[in-house]
Amino acid sequence: MGDYGFGVLVQSNTGNKSAFPVRFHPHLQPPHHHQNATPSPAAFINNNTAANGSSAGSAWLFPAPATHNIQDEILGSEKAKSQQQEQQDPLEKQQLSPSPGQEAGILPETEKAKSEENQGDNSSENGNGKEKIRIESPVLTGFDYQEATGLGTSTQPLTSSASSLTGFSNWSAAIAPSSSTIINEDASFFHQGGVPAASANNGALLFQNFPHHVSPGFGGSFSPQIGPLSQHHPHHPHFQHHHSQHQQQRRSPASPHPPPFTHRNAAFNQLPHLANNLNKPPSPWSSYQSPSPTPSSSWSPGGGGYGGWGGSQGRDHRRGLNGGITPLNSISPLKKNFASNHIQLQKYARPSSAFAPKSWMEDSLNRADNIFPFPDRPRTFDMHSLESSLIDIMRAENDTIKGRLNYSYPGSDSSLLINARTYGRRRGQSSLFPMEDGFLDDGRGDQPLHSGLGSPHCFSHQNGERVERYSRKVFVGGLPPDIDEDEITASFRRFGPLIVDWPHKAESKSYFPPKGYAFLLFQDESSVQALIDACIEEDGKLYLCVSSPTIKDKPVQIRPWNLSDSDFVMDGSQPLDPRKTIFVGGVPRPLRAVELAMIMDRLYGGVCYAGIDTDPELKYPKGAGRVAFSNQQSYIAAISARFVQLQHGEIDKRVEVKPYVLDDQLCDECQGARCGGKFAPFFCANVTCLQYYCEYCWAAIHSRAGREFHKPLVKEGGDRPRHISFRWN
């Protein structure tokens, strides 16, 4: 738009008018041939011209430490060059800056060329930069900064300057001023809430120490144009370290206005850890954040640099706190939305371990914030840790109250060491809710059987071999009364070779199922899956239409047995002890292991495992189950009851409970010494014994008073213990 300024006339207490200077274009300015001591910015604000004849200045602004004329503002370019060289030499020595040779080595060739091209326009900045920079409103300018010895040509330390607000008294050395060859102004940082005092040693600008753990809710994510005054005030000056003149910072046209309420984000714009990245080159990753074609731009809204507008400092500060607070979106029509920060997610892919439990506070330790400078850091914020925690919560809701469903998948038996001979083949995967099933219902609840083929928990192939998920024996109920074996076979032959069977078929010599149900024994397990796919699901049950000579398309219930329902681990952290396992006889076949575990845990507590005994060939339930407890008290309470009422849905049956007897245990009394190392044949289920005995030890122990009525249990076929009558000799 051009190099223009404006002036404001304010009424002082003395009645005189203090005319604030107007910056004119260099071609329109008259030449001057004298130079006085360059005043401070505060003095320049309160400076009175010779026309009003007063040196007091405006009483409501800052007192002028030196008298200054408006004619002293603009210098010749030749004299400014010499003063600039004289000013920078002692300043570089005081602030331990690298030598010009070293700076030339660090400076990129493109930036170095820019500095040489703009040296002519930049020649008068250090000599009278503080005059040219005062294009802002004089009302707010006094709160931006005080005189620093590194700004003007005067090298006298201004030790008398102090903060006008007593509340802000702790200041720390930060960044020395430097000229910008791009915008022809001295770039400086914001100093909100007070006027920092200048250092008497090296002229470095001082600003307040704020703790890093300031609440993230007061960050810099406020829009630059939220305030009503932001539309009426031009740019505020901002100091910049002279080392960073090699990586020139540009203001993005997308956010031309600084935040008007400077006290809101003062604590986050001057953080000590921001100054550590000044000497680091900008990252080309941030080029998407600014319309500038050069990768050195960090003044765009998305730029994570140390001086960027738009609240990126407060946003980055919140990332370190893991507060989980998303930045406020800008309401400015000129400012980009912060949603563009998520573009960085494409460059830094999330690790596959995001689903592992992860603490919010430990999340910052593994991030790239400690490696990359601000422009290079991934913009994942706290959503990564927040999303990880939400996933853990959702997964916990799908687990059981005390244990984990889907504890082990087929082929992963190593996750829980269970004796396969004693406790079953696999740990199952099933759902607790809902459990509305009946005697003719398999109780699968909300697990559609026909959709099981595509279930992520069921693997159709494993190590090149097909994994069976269903028993080859299928229950069919509700058959027409006049249907015979041949008609049943013809109705289901399209799914694969099969044999029709029902209880006592050989003895009855009947061609019709006596009670309206039968079992289909398929040759291949894939035939069962094909049958399930052809069924119609209603209320969690599967139906298929079958015709007879008198009834056409009668729906019959298809009840397959899911192999994963044979076992259920409620508490995988507890070891399974055979001495704390009970045998449950007469279990209804639709009852699943998870349902048996929940019933026993509700009655006695401490259940860690439940299993359904299945046929070793067809893997179909045999009508018995096992329950393992984690403590002796629950085990004794279960076997002392002897009978348990199993109530679940339509199931209401009284079953018998006995200790689970093993056939490979040595005698607990003699450890096989009296019986030649043979396994103990007897087990005493009385709560006073609960031990295995050989024949000799049983006779010796139970001949005592009070134990003569104990009945031993023996292991027999079908994993069922039975009572035997022990006769005394």
From Swiss-Prot:
Biased composition (Basic residues): 24-35, 232-249
InterPro entries, A to Z: CEBP_ZZ (IPR032296), CEBP_ZZ_sf (IPR038446), CPEB (IPR034819), Nucleotide-bd_a/b_plait_sf (IPR012677), RBD_domain_sf (IPR035979), RRM_dom (IPR000504)
Ranges of compositional bias, category Gly residues: 301-313
SUBUNIT field: Interacts with TOB1.
Origin superkingdom: Eukaryota
Site (RNA-binding): 473
Functional note: Sequence-specific RNA-binding protein that binds to the cytoplasmic polyadenylation element (CPE), an uridine-rich sequence element (consensus sequence 5'-UUUUUAU-3') within the mRNA 3'-UTR. RNA binding results in a clear conformational change analogous to the Venus fly trap mechanism. Regulates activation of unfolded protein response (UPR) in the process of adaptation to ER stress in liver, by maintaining translation of CPE-regulated mRNAs in conditions in which global protein synthesis is inhibited.
Chain positions of site Important for the positionning of RRM1 relative to RRM2: 561
Positions contributing to Zn(2+) 1 binding: 667, 675, 694, 697
Sites bearing Phosphoserine, chain numbering: 97, 99, 137, 252, 255, 330, 332
Source species taxonomy: Eukaryota, Metazoa, Chordata, Craniata, Vertebrata
Amino-acid positions noted as binding Zn(2+) 2 in the UniProt annotation, renumbered to this chain: 684, 689, 702, 710
Protein name: Cytoplasmic polyadenylation element-binding protein 4
Domain RRM per the UniProt entry, residue ranges: 472-563, 580-662
Endoplasmic reticulum keyword on record: yes
Keywords tagged on the record: Cell projection, Cytoplasm, Endoplasmic reticulum, Metal-binding, Phosphoprotein, Repeat, RNA-binding, Synapse, Zinc
RNA-binding as annotated region, ranges: 541-543
Entries under PANTHER family matching the protein: CYTOPLASMIC POLYADENYLATION ELEMENT BINDING PROTEIN CPEB, CYTOPLASMIC POLYADENYLATION ELEMENT-BINDING PROTEIN 4
Family affiliation: Belongs to the RRM CPEB family.
Species this chain originates from: Homo sapiens
Chain spans, region Disordered: 20-49, 78-133, 218-328
Subcellular localization, as worded in the UniProt entry: Cytoplasm; Cell projection, Dendrite; Cell projection, Dendritic spine; Postsynaptic density
